[in-house]
Amino acid sequence: MISIYAKPPFLRVNEATGDSYVCRVSSRIRGEEISEYMGTKYNAEERAVDDLCIFIKPRSLNSIEDGDYVDVLDGIELIPMLKERPGVKVIAMSQVHYEYLKNELKNEIYLIHHHHINFERFRRTKNDILAGGMIGHSPEAYNTYNQIKESLAPVGIEFLGAFNYKTRQDMIDFFKKIDFFVAWWGDYDRTGFYNHPTKIINPASFGIPALTQPFIGGYKEFDGFYIPIEDMNSLVEEAVKLKDDSYYQIWSDKVFQEAEKYHISQIAELYKQLK
């Protein structure tokens, strides 16, 4: 049986705003949610001889045996340890992540993407007044949100933010309110090996197109399924185009269908293939 081990998520207070937000979300996504959906063990006190063990971003490899799996995520500190333990198997979370790890490690590497949050396959219908939205919890996110909201107001487009979300349901409730999503990266490093497209696949699973600055490799598996922007002017231009119902429907259908590849039922099949 699959047995997943992960450190629990926790809340951290944003000193700039006083709000709390969830850290270590990967434990909930690739630990709790996958375990509950598949009926696997989760943080079991004892391991059986025939358990297939997956450790999500562990601090060390001390308790990990050859043949176990390590889900690296953004744990760059694990790479030197894994080089010393080629018998430990590795899980990558995106295509660019997989390619990087393949180049760095001699270990067996398996690609398993994040599943999206829309287990129920809920489909959005467009608001009468177009509304966009973004998520985040950094001080920069608040500043960006205000800039985008002010830029869209003159063209009659509403803009909402979700900064204090803590549960999957919080995110579902948010996505049910918006027609398009903005992933604004600004000066953020878009070349990192640990980048992945989940941030734009989540809204896509509701039929919500994303406007975003392209990642170098990080969006590789979702290329062609988001609307590229470069600056605030292009963001406004592309958002205005989405007012057209026919144009919007083309994008909504396109991204909704592609996001099905990342439904939890599809991702669970990849876990079942591990040996």
Model-derived features with residue positions:
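Alpha-helix C-terminal capping/helix-to-coil transition sites in glycosyltransferase folds
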Residues: 48-50, 86, 176-177
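Short beta-strand elements of ligand-binding domains
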Residues: 56, 68-75, 111-112, 211-213
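Membrane-proximal helix-turn-helix segments that form the acceptor-binding/catalytic region
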Residues: 72-90, 104
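A charged, aromatic-enriched C-terminal amphipathic alpha-helix characteristic of glycosyltransferases
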Residues: 29, 119, 230-234, 243-275
